Structures are given as structure tokens and as C-alpha cells.
């Protein structure tokens, strides 16, 4: 049975059925593997690449300021927990699994071959960290009546509604929680997802999933090379410097002076958009028109009329848009005015390719992800400026949602959402 919500998005009725299915699937707990064996030499993309690791504990979660890895997955879940105590059990369990998976170790051995194996085995006997990050975010729906958390909802968190060019599919929208899983290689990302699902059959049910990628050489540059999207343009050139701590406090992280609930400090608002590209149509569009639409040179990434990718466009000297069109993507997204300074955000997008659509068109596009300290000042303001841009003819947002990336786990005695659940 389906109903239409107030935003005009078809929503399937799920939770009650999924709760029953999840409970039936739970056969027993799977222990965390603590012991580390001497590591063998697994195959690597480059020397020691599989041994790269990001710290798990800290004020902020990894996977936000972390230089983009080559492989990525977005997975939204419905939470099946029945009460606040169950939700705490989920967050504690996710903390344990993330801590182990991101740091690596020996795969757990199955003591009885008559039982299911404790690990999928797809990474072999040693689970290398492989630069894995798993970023946990919560959606607007987690703050409904189920867990009594409504008074603690981040002030700017809201359900994603349609923009004029959207064609949203309810099956690809929203979620109680969202995992952004990134690593050097796709098998590590898949292993992490399967591990988490195996440990949470009565607590989580997958709502939607999308896998993304950037080129390996862009990933290996550790942020020095801008990834190229499937329209052939560099994606993320105008990002603020993620290594500038003072700037990140201003742009990305929720701080104490924002009058948000105290538990949100150190977290970040996350906007996710699944954007389908009309690549066949785009590939038949003249180069000059493509560059006019974006406002950049396709090969170098430089603003039109300039030489280098990171040159700052001078819109004041081009008030009529003769060089960079007034409706170009870069000019609308960031007009470079004093007023637009407050709408800066950190983009962390990935390409996707899924085969073909029902109409026989290539199903390719962008998994747009951005982080900001204020959702309304950041993504929502930028997207409103982009409404009606020339690029809309070639792109179609089909899903996604707005989420809040939780603050980091401080140490081994802490867990995700601890400050939220203790209120």
C-alpha cells in the first residue's frame, strides 16, 4: 500500500513489515574480532594502499574533510528499533563495527562450520583498512514520535521537497539514517555494507542504495586533482579549502554560537541529491554551448576568459555576461558577492553508472553530496539560485534527502549519538 505525503512524493508503507522480517532474521549475535594476525601482503593498487587508514575517534567524523577515495556508496536505511533503548543499541553496535572495519584486523573465525560464517570472506583472512571511512547521518524522520527525540532535532533539518526540475522517486528518497561508505577499492566498500547488515537484521532495513566512483588518479592525488564528472567537466573546483580549520569551522561544522541543540556541535548538515544525466543528448551538444552552460573551459576547468582552473572569475568586470553567461552554472552557484559568502558548502560528489533506463538510455549521473553548517544558508540557497539554469535541460534529480552527520565518537568509551540519547 502507498500514500502520497504532503510533498507529493509516493511513500511505501514499510516499517511494520520490515520490523517483523528483521526480527525473524536475527539468529544470534556476531562477535567483534579483536585479535590481529600478522598481515600478509594482499594485492594493492599501489604500495601499501590497502594499509592506509583514517582515524576513527575524534571531534568530527571521517569521510567529510577526508580527501575523496576512489569508491563510494550511499545507503539509506529505515530504523526498525522499537524504542529509545533499541536505538541506543543500534548506535553502539554501529560504533563498534565502524571502529573495527576502518582500522582493520583479522577476519573473525567461525568456530562451528555448521553455523553461518562470521564474515563474508570477500576480503580474505585479513580485513585491510583500505582507507575506509563510514559516515553516519540521521534523517528528519528519526525525530518523529517513535523515540521521543523531536525536541532535539537539528533546527534546520527538514524533509527534502521538490524543486521545479526534480522528478523524485519515493523509493530513492529520504531515510532514518544514511551511511556514506568510501574506500580505495569497491570490494572494501561492499564488505563494510554486508558486515553492517549482517550485524543489524532486527535494527536496520535498506531503503535505497547507490554506488559511485571517481578516477583512481584523482583519488590518489589526495585532493590536489579535481575529479571529472560524466559530463566531462571538473566537479568541485570552487570547493573551500578543507585543510583550513578556521574556514571549516565557518563553512562545515555546527558550532556553539548557532543556537542549535548542544549535541549537534561538531556535526554537519548533509544534502544528498541523486542526479541523472541525459548523456546522449549532452554528447550531441556543441562544445561552445557546453562551456557556456558551465561557464568553464572543458579541458582546463578555467573560468571562461581565464587561464587556470582555480582562477577566480571577475564578474564585476563582466556585468552583462558576455564572457561568463549570467545563467551559467558557476555564476549562479557562487556569484562571488558579499551576500553569497554565507552559502559556501563543501562538495563531495561521485559519478554513478547503472546500465540503461527502461527507455533504453544510459543511466549515468552524479551522486551529489555536500556538507555545511547551515542547510538553509548552504545548499537550499544555492539550489534556489540554480532554479532555471541552462544545465537543467540535461540533468534530472531523481532522489536523495537531507540529513545531519553526527558529531564524531570521542574515544573508546563513547558511541554515536551519545549526547543526543542521554538528553
Swiss-Prot record:
* Expression induction: Repressed by Fur in the presence of iron. Repressed at high pH by the two-component regulatory system CpxA/CpxR.
Provide the E.C. number(s) assigned to this enzyme. Answer: 4.98.1.1, 1.11.1.-
Job description of the protein: Involved in the recovery of exogenous heme iron. Extracts iron from heme while preserving the protoporphyrin ring intact. Also displays peroxidase activity on guaiacol in vitro.
Q: Name one GO cellular component term.
A: outer membrane-bounded periplasmic space
In this chain, heme b is annotated as bound at 236-238, 329, 334-336, 347
Q: Which cofactor does it need?
A: heme b
Q: How is it modified after translation?
A: Exported by the Tat system. The position of the signal peptide cleavage has been experimentally proven. Can also be exported by the Sec system.
Q: Where is it mainly found?
A: periplasm
Instruction: Please list the residues that bind protoporphyrin IX.
Output: 236-238, 296
Q: Name one Pfam family in it.
A: Dyp_perox_N
Q: Which InterPro entries match?
A: Dimeric_a/b-barrel, Dyp_perox_C, Dyp_perox_N, Dyp_peroxidase, EfeB/EfeN, TAT_signal
Describe the subunit structure: Homodimer. Part of a ferrous iron transporter composed of EfeU, EfeO and EfeB. However, this EfeUOB tripartite iron transporter is defective in E.coli strain K12 due to a frameshift mutation in EfeU.
Give the protein's recorded name. Deferrochelatase
Keywords of the record, alphabetical order, are: Heme, Iron, Lyase, Metal-binding, Oxidoreductase, Periplasm, Peroxidase, Signal
Secretion signal, residue range per the UniProt entry: 1-35
**Is Hydrolase found in the keyword set?**
no
Provide the protein's localization: Periplasm
Which gene carries the instructions for this protein?
Answer: efeB
Keyword field contains Oxidoreductase: yes
For molecular function, the Gene Ontology terms on record are: ferrochelatase activity; heme binding; metal ion binding; peroxidase activity
Q: How are cofactors bound according to the entry's free-text note? A: Binds 1 heme b (iron(II)-protoporphyrin IX) group non-covalently per subunit.
Q: Name one GO biological process term.
A: iron import into cell
Protein family (similarity comment)? Belongs to the DyP-type peroxidase family. EfeB subfamily.
Reactions it catalyzes: heme b + 2 H(+) = protoporphyrin IX + Fe(2+)
Amino acid at each position: 500500500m502507498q500514500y502520497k505525503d504532503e510533498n507529493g512524493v509516493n511513500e511505501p508503507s514499510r516499517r511494520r513489515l520490515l520490523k517483523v522480517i528483521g526480527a525473524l532474521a536475527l539468529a544470534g549475535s556476531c562477535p567483534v574480532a579483536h585479535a590481529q594476525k600478522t598481515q600478509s601482503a594482499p594485492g594493492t593498487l599501489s604500495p601499501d594502499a590497502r594499509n592506509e587508514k583514517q582515524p576513527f575517534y575524534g571531534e568530527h567524523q571521517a569521510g567529510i574533510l577526508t580527501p575523496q577515495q576512489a569508491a563510494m556508496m550511499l545507503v539509506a536505511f529505515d530504523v526498525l528499533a522499537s524504542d529509545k533503548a533499541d536505538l541506543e543499541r543500534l548506535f553502539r553496535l554501529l560504533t563498534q563495527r565502524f571502529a573495527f572495519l576502518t582500522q582493520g584486523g583479522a577476519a573473525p573465525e567461525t568456530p562451528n562450520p555448521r553455523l553461518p560464517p562470521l564474515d563474508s570472506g570477500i576480503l580474505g583472512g585479513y580485513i585491510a583498512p583500505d582507507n575506509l571511512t563510514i559516515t553516519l547521518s540521521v534523517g528528519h524522520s528519526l525525530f518523529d514520535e517513535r523515540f521521543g527525540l523531536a525536541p532535539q532535532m537539528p533546527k534546520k533539518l527538514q524533509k527534502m521537497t521538490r524543486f521545479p526540475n526534480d522528478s523524485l522517486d519515493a523509493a530513492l528518497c529520504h531515510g532514518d539514517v544514511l551511511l556514506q561508505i568510501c574506500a580505495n577499492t569497491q570490494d572494501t566498500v561492499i564488505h563494510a555494507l554486508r558486515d553492517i547488515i549482517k550485524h543489524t537484521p532486527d535494527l536496520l532495513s535498506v531503503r535505497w542504495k547507490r554506488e559511485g566512483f571517481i578516477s583512481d588518479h584523482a583519488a590518489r592525488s589526495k585532493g590536489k586533482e579535481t575529479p571529472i564528472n560524466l559530463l566531462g567537466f571538473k566537479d568541485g573546483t570552487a570547493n573551500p579549502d578543507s585543510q583550513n580549520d578556521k574556514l571549516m569551522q565557518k563553512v562545515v561544522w555546527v558550532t556553539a554560537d548557532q543556537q542549535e541543540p548542544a549535541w549537534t556541535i561538531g556535526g554537519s548538515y548533509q544534502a544528498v541529491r541523486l542526479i541523472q544525466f541525459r548523456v546522449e543528448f549532452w554528447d550531441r551538444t556543441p562544445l561552445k554551448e557546453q562551456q557556456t552552460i558551465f561557464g568553464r573551459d572543458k579541458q582546463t576547468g578555467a573560468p571562461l576568459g581565464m587561464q587556470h582552473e582555480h582562477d577566480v572569475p571577475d564578474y564585476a568586470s563582466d556585468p552583462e555576461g558576455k564572457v561568463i553567461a549570467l545563467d551559467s552554472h558557476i555564476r549562479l552557484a557562487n556569484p562571488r558577492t558579499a551576500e553569497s559568502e554565507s552559502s559556501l558548502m563543501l562538495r563531495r560528489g561521485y559519478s554513478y553508472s547503472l546500465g540503461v533506463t527502461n527507455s533504453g538510455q544510459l543511466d549515468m549521473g552524479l551522486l551529489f553530496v555536500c556538507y555545511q553548517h547551515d542547510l538553509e544558508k548552504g545548499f537550499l540557497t544555492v539550489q534556489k539560485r540554480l532554479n532555471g539554469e541552462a544545465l537543467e535541460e540535461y540533468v534530472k534529480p531523481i532522489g536523495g534527502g537531507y540529513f545531519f552527520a553526527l558529531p564524531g565518537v570521542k574515544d573508546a568509551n563513547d558511541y554515536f549519538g551519545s549526547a543526543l540519547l542521554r538528553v
